[in-house]
Amino acid sequence: MHFGSPNLTCNRKILDGVISGLSNYGNCVGVPTVSSEITFADCYERNPVVNAMAVGYTNKKVFTSKPSKKGSVYYVGAKTGRDGIGGAMMASEQFTGDEGIKRPTVQVGDPYLEKLLIEASLELFETGAVIASQDMGAAGLTSSTTEIALKGNMGMLIHISKIPLREENMEPWEI
């Protein structure tokens, strides 16, 4: 994790929020925060970089993201909202300092739903009924559908009108 000086109130607030969010979310999902590293530098003023990952192991292969045959596509998880839109794009931007404070584009997570989804997915994978599975990633449906279609060397037809929405009147590009 890389932050601006913790002596500035705005940076301290961001730092405290990130640490709280990581520990609370991981705890609710049942994945402990084992290790972290924090550095401070002026280039991260108001625009921190936080990389996180979860690592696990299994003694057997229970899922794949490469479909071996054609099948139906199911969207499983929380309803889609506008939160997080532009997050991946903003993470790649360069900041000159003239922009002011960038509005956060953080996705709203639900660790309790995620825990249930993880457990249900693992049970479903065990049945052999799932052809392939792909996480949403930073670009949501755009990345997950494209990645799984590419890995399977096939096309995909998505009916975005059937995607469960958390907000009304969302434009197709927002979904």
What do the PLM-derived regions correspond to, one by one?
Residues 1-175:
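Glycine/proline-enriched, intrinsically flexible loops and inter-domain linkers
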